[in-house]
A protein has these predicted regions:
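Intrinsic-disorder/low-complexity accessory segments
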Residues: 28-176, 224, 230-231, 236-242, ...
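Short, solvent-exposed turn/loop segments enriched in Gly/Ser/Thr/Pro and often Arg
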Residues: 181-185, 195, 258-266, 705-706
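Carboxylate/His-rich catalytic cores and anion/metal-binding grooves
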Residues: 157-160, 174-202
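Boundary at the C-terminal end of the N-terminal hydrophobic targeting segment
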Residues: 20-29
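Bacterial N-terminal signal peptides
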Residues: 10-20
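Active-site cavity-forming subdomains of large catalytic enzyme subunits
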Residues: 193-213, 233, 239-240, 252, ...
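Bacterial N-terminal signal peptides that target proteins for export
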Residues: 1-11
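Aromatic- and acidic-residue-enriched carbohydrate-binding clefts of CAZyme catalytic domains
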Residues: 208-226
């Protein structure tokens, strides 16, 4: 640990004083830029943030529109900065990249970019990069309520653009600095507006003051409560995808991800703990963190600010904004500043002020640029050697190619392909049928990913098991493979499969009605992940649909076609629309969802049940309520909200937990309770939920909500799984307590499970073997009803990630999904979030089934 021990209290008090009285721009510049010695140090034509905004930085929270306007103002007054809008957030706020470099570099920026790109091409010599500028990426406020860094972004950009110092001019000649000034504008404005709304004058430092205590969902996450710092690999959010596209245009040499942590901490920067390093990443990459750390330490030493390194934070997973660049030959760094969460707050170090937190972030940012310029040659060598070593590492792998794809699920196949292309991974079409590891893949519906490629390490991250690391104390998830989560068939081949042409863009969705106007019915195979979207669109237009609870084969215009259990049947008779109007409605849903609709001329099947069978059941139109508010796990309920909004296009009501006993529940067919604490729900609300379930409602719970539902007798008759073992009361070292507690955490493990594919909740799941994400310690006993345990974790499970032996024994054989029939309704209990982080499509389709088929899953009804 490196811990600088100069007294920090006088600096905090000085910053607190600065809050209480207006400061001239010159005085504020002296506070944030103590290295600038006089007023002539800056170009007077370039406005300071204070001059433009009308208030001193740190005296209030800057809204995103103001931040955007300031960066645009800088571009009006200087030829050293260009501002590009690369996208918009879900709430419509601009996403920016600001490029800061010397004017002469801007004049040849594309030439510089192309020259720099030779570093990531193993076939190009190191000399091809020449003396091109080093590329630095500064990413701010990915967690919206870690607010100091976006304020620091304005000051850092101002300094680089306006400083007249010879050193700064050298930096701009030898560096291209990319600013992502607010990666999460929706969350940041949520936090900024709260802090501004509850600010007092004079400011209150009481940690219990409302200014410091954000309500649900807080500003950490984006509009859909996504943790964007864990979305760099999955890229589920439109906030994430544009910046990754820019990342791959530039491949920065250094990337800093600015964060905040608890108020009683100091400042953290890497190197990270050696036990948290990925074996996929060359040791030289991690060693360079130590080189860059010298410049961060120097910057904070000059301020007398406390800091530490080498503790706490993982550094092995490409899901993070500081580790994703490590997987591309850059030096990625997480920095963490103790957060004031308001203008001033009491801490163990004294009064912690907003300006003080901002100043540390400015110092680290400028120290990063200084370090990158000074170490440019070594950084170029590092990146060149990284991609060359990727080919050598790939050659040593037993698996030579990965194949993926499912002819019956083009939607998820296409989605996984799109993700790979976003990461610049080489993918080729499968031009001949192959069987790999017992799985069959057809030409035209599957793809090949060669392992021998420059992006090998990212290929491994997506398809292979997360390699074990030395540590067993984790900050976040312990496994991150994407392919198992998608639920699409994939396999690794020990022999190289060449494949056909390289894929440069995903194919367009082939949504259409095949065969013209139907005389009897239309049918959609439920195995296509987008079938649910088509169903929601049809029901939204008043079209009634049915679901076949058993497979059938029938004649179509394309010949005999087999449909899996769960497939949709839309009869022509009895609809509010007829003839051409019904055809156009069905065709519109097919085009929008990208699914194929078959035309049926008869209700008689070639094989399996006929279309008039009791096994072809009428579907009710779902009316869904999502419970979200204080106590609810925001990221979990946000994933359900995202699934309904963005995947199904199905509207949902958002209820506060305290509303459950006050609003009429009978309007809802489905209520979803994600993980969280529901102890605040009173007995009146519990009784209302019980009556609603008994009358035919379907209550969907997961994680701690499932535990709560069992304890409240909402899922009467069900039992929790093995309780955690009693604590070992033998004597332990005081200093080991955090590590011991962390070892027993369950945090993001991929486990193998068995799924009953004949159950309505599992319709569309292609195989009995299912990967599930285990994220908590809740376990469920299999149901006493033999037909009601839908998913059960294997005994023993195959584990991808770290899971202690004690926890392996606890989860083995437990139920992961079961149905508890209660009167005319039911409670659908998941042990974990089935839509985890918005990319677990292999299990979020179980939640989709619970929404559409929830009234049809009780054993007596299903076999009635």
């Amino acid at each position: 640990v490196s811990l600088h021990r100069r007294a920090v209290l006088p600096l905090l008090l000085a910053a607190a004083t600065a809050l209480s009285s207006p400061q001239p721009a010159q005085a504020q510049s002296a506070y944030f830029f103590p290295q600038a010695t006089d007023a002539t140090a800056f170009d007077a034509a370039v406005p300071t943030p204070e001059q433009f905004l009308g208030y001193p930085i740190g005296s209030r929270y800057t809204r995103h529109d103001q931040l955007v306007a300031y960066f645009q103002e800088l571009a009006k007054h200087s030829d050293k900065i260009r501002v590009q809008q690369i996208g918009r957030s879900y709430e419509g706020r601009p996403l920016l990249i600001a490029t800061v470099t010397a004017a002469s570099n801007h004049a040849r920026l594309e030439q510089i970019r192309q020259q720099h790109a030779t570093l990531v091409d193993p076939a190009q010599p190191r000399s091809a990069a020449g003396d091109s500028p080093v590329v630095v990426w500064l990413g701010y406020s990915v967690h919206g309520n870690e607010t100091s860094s976006a304020e620091a972004a304005m000051l850092t950009a101002y300094y680089l653009v306006a400083s007249r110092s010879a050193e700064t001019q050298q930096w701009l000649q030898q560096a291209v600095v990319l600013f992502d000034p607010a990666q999460n504008p929706d969350g940041r404005d949520r936090a900024a507006n709260w802090h501004n709304a509850w600010a007092s004058d004079p400011a209150s430092a009481d940690p219990a003051d409302k200014e410091h205590v954000e309500p649900f969902p807080q500003g950490r996450t984006n509009h859909y409560f996504t943790d964007l710092n864990r979305d760099w690999l999955a890229l589920t959010q439109q906030d994430s995808r544009p910046k990754v596209e820019v990342f791959h245009q530039w491949y920065p040499n250094v990337q800093i991800d600015f964060h905040e942590m608890g108020k009683d901490s100091t400042y953290y920067f890497e190197p990270s703990p050696k036990s948290m390093h990925s074996p996929l990443i060359p040791a030289a990459s991690y060693e360079f963190n130590k080189t860059l750390a010298k410049y961060h330490a120097q910057a904070l030493d000059a301020l007398g600010s406390l800091y530490y390194t080498g503790e706490n934070f993982d550094n092995f997973s490409p899901v993070y904004g500081s580790t994703y660049p490590d997987f591309h030959g850059a030096v990625g760094v997480t920095v963490e500043q103790a957060s004031s969460r308001g203008r001033v707050q009491e801490s163990v170090n004294g009064l912690l002020t907003f300006p003080f937190t901002i100043r540390n972030q400015v110092a680290t940012g400028l120290g990063t640029v200084r370090g990158a310029v000074t170490e440019r040659s070594g950084l170029f060598d590092l990146q060149k050697q990284f991609f060359q070593s990727a080919l050598k590492q790939a050659a040593q792998q037993p698996v030579k190619s990965f194949v993926f794809g499912d002819a019956h699920d083009p939607a998820l196949t296409r989605r996984l392909l799109e993700l790979l292309l976003l990461h610049r991974i080489e993918v080729r079409v499968l031009d001949r049928a192959v069987t790999v590891d017992g799985q069959h893949f057809d030409a035209g519906s599957a793809y090949v990913v060669p392992v021998q490629q420059a992006q090998f390490r990212l290929v491994h991250s997506i398809f292979a098991e997360t390699p074990p690391i030395k540590g067993d104390v984790f900050y976040g998830s312990t496994s991150y493979a994407i392919a198992p989560a998608y639920g699409v068939a994939f396999a690794g081949s020990r022999s190289r499969i060449e494949g056909g042409a390289r894929v440069t863009a995903p194919p367009a969705g082939q949504g259409a009605v095949l065969g013209g106007q139907a005389g009897f019915a239309y049918a959609i195979d439920w195995r296509d992940y987008n079938a649910g979207r088509a169903l929601a669109a049809l029901q939204g237009k008043g079209v009634s649909a049915r679901a076949a609870f058993q497979p059938f084969t029938t004649a179509t215009a394309q010949g005999d076609v087999s449909f899996a259990a769960g497939s949709l049947v839309i009869p022509v008779a009895g609809q509010p629309l007829q003839g051409a109007a019904l055809l156009e409605t069905v065709a519109s849903a097919a085009r929008e969802a990208g699914v194929q609709v078959h035309v049926l001329s008869s209700g008689r099947s070639r094989e399996g049940i006929d279309l008039g069978s009791d096994g072809v059941k009428a579907l009710r139109k779902p009316v869904v309520a999502l419970v979200m508010g204080e106590g609810v796990a925001a990221t979990e309920i946000g994933s359900a909200w995202f699934l309904l909004d963005q995947q199904l296009h199905l509207p949902a009501s958002k209820l506060d937990p305290q509303q459950l006993g006050k609003v009429p529940l009978d309007r809802y067919t489905t209520i979803v309770l994600s993980g969280g604490s529901y102890t605040g729900i009173d007995t009146t609300a519990v009784a209302a939920l019980k009556r609603w379930v008994q009358a035919g409602g379907s209550l969907v719970t997961y994680g701690s909500a499932s535990k709560w539902a069992i304890e409240q007798k909402l899922a009467d008759g069900e039992k929790l799984g093995k309780e955690e073992d009693a604590a070992d009361e033998s004597r332990r070292a005081f200093g080991d307590q955090r590590d011991i507690a962390a070892i027993e955490r369950v945090s993001g493990n991929i486990l193998s499970a068995d799924v009953d594919t004949s159950h309505p909740l599992a319709f569309g799941v292609p195989r009995r073997q299912l990967a599930i994400n285990k994220e908590n310690t809740v376990t469920l006993q299999p149901s006493t009803n033999p037909f009601s345990t839908v998913v059960r974790i294997d005994t023993p499970p195959r584990v991808n990630g770290y899971l202690s032996e004690r926890n392996r024994a606890r989860v083995a054989g437990s139920a992961w999904l079961l149905v508890s029939a209660q009167g005319q309704g039911n409670v659908v209990l998941f042990a974990d979030d089935p839509a985890h982080r918005k990319y677990w499509h292999g299990t979020d389709r179980l939640l989709i089934n619970a929404i559409f088929f929830g009234n049809l899953v009780n054993p007596a009804k299903a076999r009635g």
